[in-house]
Each structure stands twice: as C-alpha cells, then as structure tokens.
Amino acid sequence: MKKNSFVKRLFLLLSAFCLCLVFAAPVSAATIIDEWGKVVTPAAPQLKEVKLPAEGTALLLLDFNKQVCNDKSRPRCVSSIPAVSRLLGEARKANILVVYSLTAGSAAPDIAPALAPRPGDPIVTSGPDKFLGTELEKILKDRNIKTVIVTGTAAHGAVICTASGAALRGIKVVIPVDGISAESLYPEQYTVWHLLNAPRVATMTTVTKTDMIQIGTK
C-alpha cells in the first residue's frame, strides 16, 4: 500500500511539473509572414503644393534609360515621361541644376529623348543608391543644394535609395508621385509610404505631383 501510495504521489508530482513546463514555455510570436493577410493598406497621403526657390534646388532624373524604362519591362516608367518632361521644362526655365543617373551598361543617348540631357548636365552611373561610388554628393554640395526633386525608376530602387540618401544627408526631398515608377503599383505605394514614415527620412520628405510644384518662387 505504501509503495502504491508513493508511486501515485510521484506520478501526480511529475504530472504537475510537466504542466508547469507547458504553461511556462514561451509562446512563439507571430511573424509578418504568418500575418501577411491581415495587413491593412494605409490611407493614401495628402499631396501638397510645393513652392521652391531656384537657388538651392535640383531636379534628379534617375535611370530614364531605355534598358529599364521601356514598354516591355516597365511601361509605367514610359507613361511617367510626359509629366517628368513638363517638370523638366519648368526646371530649365528656372535654370536650376538638373542631374541625371544611368544604370550600369547604359549611356547618355539611351535616356528617353523627351528627357535628354543638355551639355554640361551632370550624369552619374551606379546601382540603386546614386550617392554610392559617384560624385553626386559633391555635385550637390558644390551648388549648395538644399532641396532635391526626385523622379525616376525604379521607385523601390533608385528612387527610394537616393531619396533616403539625400534626406539622411540633410537635404530636403520632394517626390512627385507621377514622376516615379515601378513594374507594378505596390512598389510605388511602398516607396511613398516608406519615405513618409522612415525615421529621419520622413521629416525631410514631401509628396506631391509634378503640376503642384512651382520652381523659382521665394
């Protein structure tokens, strides 16, 4: 009897111990992959009118070369060219600095004709971050640039990297949403959201449209 009683008590103790381990075990937190379908799309940001002085402002045209901006691989880039061309015209009238970038393996003649650079316009060639391994930072510093209008493709490549790089260097960033593009809508949406919410970048970024930008105002 005593032996059976001891075994019974031991069994109960072991059972209680096991239950404690079960309840004490940390619960694995759900990851973004687990909850992917629960993500709610943020409300669209409000676009703002932007008035910029000619002095201290530059227009960046990123990777409008035919290798990446074409009807087959990125038709949304081609569709953005008329709006960017109009903005470029305003930039030329205001005589502000216009800087171009190219992807590796391309050259100035590959840029969309409507956006063709003029002699003397700076052109840099690099990967997505146009500051990395180029003279872009020096070009902007030499002209005392305080604000850059960033246009180009891809939104989730050259635009987000270069705009963030400018903001983190203390340069204000203006993003005309009709002047950036990607293969589909989501990367463009994500890029806008990121630039308006990322630490240190958000406070330096304004989102607008090309026809809401005035250049040459005090």
Which residues does each PLM region occupy?
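Bacterial N-terminal signal peptides that target proteins for export
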Residues: K2-L14
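Bacterial N-terminal signal peptides
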Residues: L12-V22
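Sec/Tat signal peptide C-region and signal peptidase I cleavage site
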Residues: F23-A29
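Active-site-adjacent betaalpha module
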Residues: A29-A58, R86, G105-K218
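Short hydrophobic beta-strand that contains or immediately precedes a catalytic carboxylate
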Residues: L60-L62
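A cross-domain feature marking catalytic cores of carbohydrate-active enzymes
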Residues: F64, Y100-T103, V177
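Short acidic, Gly/Ser-rich segments with clustered Asp/Glu that frequently serve as metal-coordination loops
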Residues: N65-D71
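A short alpha/beta connector and helix-capping loop motif
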Residues: S73-A91, N95-Y100
